[in-house]
Amino acid sequence: MRSPEPGRNALLDAGQRLLGTADLARISVNAIVAEAGMAKGSFYQHWPSRAEYLRALHIRFHDELVESIEAAMAELPPGHDRLEAAMNAYLDGCLAEPATKALLVQSRTEAGLTDLVAARNHSAATLMMPDLQALGWSSPEPIAALLVAAVAEIALVELDARQRDDELRRGLLRLASRTPTAD
């Protein structure tokens, strides 16, 4: 039996390419299969609906980012340097992917994706809590949630400018690294 992965990946790649130039809401099954050079029936062999396809696209995008973030953090102890490495890995990954804007912003309002967005944000906040604790935050949860939102905003600024904004990146790290007062 032939593996479904090549066709599935070709369809996901096609959607990711389309999202580099089009809004999430405007990506149709017909556009996806045309971009992939596949028949419409092949789409439905992998996903029962467009909504499930968008979930798979969102999951793959974030899984790839998480891989690079975890690799950047792997050898570093919790604290400033690890937080900076994670943030830079995320932002550099977003900047390199033209579909980022659709998968970061538009997915927040797309039916069927809001639970994934919330879960990814929570996961990202949880990942940085040891760093915030090492920086002196005794109650890091609200700070982590705010940092997740701020990093996503920096990603959008950088996408619009088509380049890194090291000043924003350093500014956010300064906020996270400030000496906390009683929480």
Predicted regions and their residues:
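Short hydrophobic/aromatic patch on the recognition helix
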Residues: 37-47
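Hydrophobic alpha-helical connector segments
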Residues: 56, 70-96, 144-147, 169
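Amphipathic alpha-helical segments used for helix-helix packing
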Residues: 91-115, 156
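Hydrophobic/aromatic residues within well-ordered alpha-helical segments
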Residues: 7, 50, 57, 61, ...
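Amphipathic alpha-helical segments enriched in hydrophobic/aromatic and basic residues
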Residues: 19, 28-29, 40, 50, ...
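Basic, helix-initiating cap at the start of DNA-binding domains
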Residues: 1-22, 26-35, 52, 64
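Amphipathic alpha-helical packing segments from all-alpha helical-bundle domains
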Residues: 66, 85, 110-145, 170-173
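Hydrophobic alpha-helical segments that form the core
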Residues: 92-93, 138-160, 164-178
